[in-house]
């Protein structure tokens, strides 16, 4: 019996209910339909691939901007969202995550090389915890398998 199995048996006598992320929230894509020119003198902040890759929680002190039209439909990042890198040069670097752990009034947009996940229930997992959960070795191991 593994340590995990022992703990489940001891503390969860009725077992543990497993759910997929798809049952707990929804995935969304980053920016779409943008050209190189849209990233010159933009009017809105966007979160770069390297911001997601390099930080367990988003660095909001960024000067990266993108041009967003008044009626343009793009996904925005919300408090508690978990962001993932979609691809990388090596399998070990795929699926790196970062979490928006601070409330902000400013609209934030995600680069097109990443995707986001938003929990249906914003109180299910604290962002301060999910930033560690989604960067944990156990979860990273699962991502590398796929």
Give each language-model segment a name:
Residues 1-11, 57-71, 94, 100-102, ...:
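A cross-kingdom feature marking solvent-exposed beta-strand/loop segments within repeated
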Residues 41-43:
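Conserved secondary-structure micro-motifs at functional edges
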Residues 20-28, 38, 53-54, 58-59, ...:
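Basic, amphipathic alpha-helical recognition segments used for DNA target recognition
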Residues 3, 7-31:
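Non-catalytic DNA-recognition/assembly elements of restriction-modification systems
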Residues 22-35, 50-82:
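Sequence-specific dsDNA recognition surfaces
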Residues 48, 70-135:
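A short beta-sheet element
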